[in-house]
Structure formats: C-alpha cells, structure tokens
Amino acid sequence: MDSNKQNLINKILYRAQYRGTKEMDIFVSKFVNSIIDNLDHKELVSLDKLINFDDETLVKFSLGKNSKDFEDKIILEKLIEFKNKY
C-alpha cells in the first residue's frame, strides 16, 4: 500500500473517532471500520468528503434524506445499509 493511501486511511480513521458528539463518534467510527479495508483510493476520497459533513447532515444522509447534496451514491448506500443494520 502506498504512503498516500495509508495517510488518507489514517486521516479518515482519526476523523471518524473524533467528530463532536459521542454517539456520532461511535456510529461513524464503526461504519468506517466496517468498510475501509475494501475501498479503493477514489472511494477513500469520497468517504473522507462524507465524514467531513457535520453530524446533523450525516444523520440525514443515513436516513436517505438530502442525498442530492453528496455525489457518491455508492458510499451513501453503504452508510444507509450500515445504519439499517446498526
């Protein structure tokens, strides 16, 4: 694995754990950990963009609302699927 990809993974893992509210820290970090090993570089970039939305927007995304505000539908589908299992 190249160092750029590993740096991006580390950044995502850190950001997923330290969001703001404890509930979202737990939810987002579990979501990220469940998918991160299977993502290519492009998907990692999309995931990084997704988790940089505020908690309220991420909750709406996980409920299938406001999905037009995020371009990567595959990552959104993974978030919704994870929420439905969680």
Label each region the model flagged:
Residues 2-86:
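Positively charged, polar, low-complexity stretches
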